[in-house]
Amino acid sequence: MITWTFDDGNGNIITVPQNVIVNDVTAPTPDAPTLADVTAECEVTTLTAPTASDNCVGSVTVTNDATLPITAQGTTVVTWTYDDGNGNTTTQTQNVVIDDVTDPVAPVLADITGECSATATPPTTTDNCGGILTGTTTDALTYNTQGTFVITWTFDDGNGNIITVPQNVIVNDVTAPTPDVATLADVTAECEV
């Protein structure tokens, strides 16, 4: 409150109070009209806070509604809130785009061999987002017939990146039979055998 004094110079004086009201009703203004997308293949663990300006002296507090890390494939919209500390806020949104476009690493699979039969074990590989992946197949895992067979393994990272890798299964008997007895008894006859 300001008290004004009026004096007419003849000894007549009056005072009049006047209220001075300072009321910030202007919200902060974001420094960037739009926020650039934040992109990654697997996850976003931190976000860089944008800035805003205010008509009054003081700092603008910046917060967001994100739960970090952001790992969901696709677009997550983060809302930033600028608060001038005087009851005025402004919001601005920013897209966080997670898009895994990298295939799993193609493993080099050794042939599986056996003489009478051969059984495959599902192989593994690595993925930039999925970590360790185990191959799947609709082919048989065990083979009991002589020959070469091909198992097609599929590695799917769950984000739309799928590779297939062949693996040979070779059943090849290379061992000669072993007699049940070490030596055979002589066969003798007088006329013929």
Would you name each region that the model predicts?
Residues 1-193:
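Proline-threonine-serine-rich low-complexity tracts
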